[in-house]
Amino acid sequence: MKAKLGFNRLSRKSSHRRALLKNMVISFLKHEKISSTKAKLFEVKRFSERLITKAKVDTVHNRRELSKFIHDKYILNKLFTKISPVFRQRSGGYTRMIKLGKRYGDAAEMAILELVEKPLKAE
């Protein structure tokens, strides 16, 4: 019997999959909303929820741990100063997925991933 895999491989090799997820998570944290296929967004959701949970405690160690995955200093700072304080009281479920239907070309299920609560904009 085939054992269940812990994550979706997305039909890519490990280095390609890691680069794809890294880029999608960074753009999700930058724009606070992202649109893609449902399968990709499930994986992005897993990674981003872990990153937000880790960023709730602002220590040098946590910043270094997250900087291994997020190389953009602006996004890393935004995660620690604007996004994670909004979710301080929430113990999980920081994102929501809204299904859009099927894509015209190949009938892939599309969705939007967004943060549940919006961070306050600096005026």
UniProtKB/Swiss-Prot annotation:
It holds the Pfam family Ribosomal_L17. Gene3D superfamilies: Ribosomal protein L17 (3.90.1030.10). The keyword Ribosomal protein applies. One of its GO terms (biological process) is translation. GO terms for molecular function: structural constituent of ribosome. Keywords: Ribonucleoprotein, Ribosomal protein. The keyword Membrane does not apply. GO terms for cellular component: cytosolic large ribosomal subunit. Transmembrane segments: none annotated. SUPFAM superfamilies: Prokaryotic ribosomal protein L17. PROSITE patterns: RIBOSOMAL_L17 (PS01167). It comes from the Bacteria. Part of the 50S ribosomal subunit. Contacts protein L32. Belongs to the bacterial ribosomal protein bL17 family. This is Large ribosomal subunit protein bL17. It comes from Borreliella afzelii (strain PKo).
